[in-house]
Amino acid sequence: ISFSLVMCDDIRSRKDNPDFAVVRAMRPDITALLESRGVPVFNNLKVSEICNDKSKTYAYLSTNNIPVIPWISAEAGESAPPAPFIPCVLKPCGGHGGSGVVLAKNEAEYISLAGSMRSGYVIQRLAEDSSDTRVYVIGKKIVAAVMRRGRGDFRSNFSLGGDVCKRELTDEEKKLIYSVCELFEFGLVGIDIMYYNGHPVINEIEDTVGSRMLYATHKNIDIVSEYLDYIEKSL
């Protein structure tokens, strides 16, 4: 398999279609365009449209009886809805890597932070602790799991200085991940698990998941090679 890097803005002007495309951008419009031309895309449009929007993710999972942390959605520019939970976490629907995620510890902070949001957002109950587990999935296969823990921050993102270590999933966690996999045709994603009321719940599904944590904790896994093997068998 040979590859070439094509920027999103150049896709529309190209006349030739590739045999397949790996879209590493949060651009459902580009994925939709490629699929309309008959190009197999990894990840596909359903994954891109749902998983790059936290409100859509939580709504879709909840509709399919997949547990998530209690949440509501809100629109920027409107009066903030009454705080459903205090403390609570506010997240931009299209945020990535912990960017724009803020914690409101009381009602006054909530009103101030909600008023500062510049795009649609979700309001979520604060999880039991700052750790979560990212599960790397190719297709319907669990590749590996990495625990992340915030360092002086309620956010656990590796890019924000969180500590990471490899871990084994429990049977309950595996069952949860496989239940999510049945709802999608994934290429490569990261599914984030947190705990609520003593049980695992889904926090996010990362469409354009990065692999630095995986490389840091699982030296024996070549995620790119495994992903390419999966793509080749899928075509």
Label each PLM-derived region with a short phrase.
Residues 26, 72, 93, 126-127, ...:
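Anionic group-transfer/hydrolysis microenvironments
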Residues 38, 46-132, 170-171, 235:
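Active-site nucleotide/adenylate-binding loops and adjacent lid/helix of ATP-dependent enzymes
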Residues 155-202, 214-217, 224-235:
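A long amphipathic alpha-helix within ATP-dependent nucleotide-binding catalytic cores
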Residues 101-184:
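Phosphate-binding site of ATP-dependent enzymes
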Residues 18-20, 88-91, 135-137, 199-213:
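A short beta-strand motif that forms the metal-chelation/ATP-contact edge
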Residues 30-31, 98, 199:
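Glycine/Thr-rich phosphate-binding loops of Rossmann-like dinucleotide-binding domains
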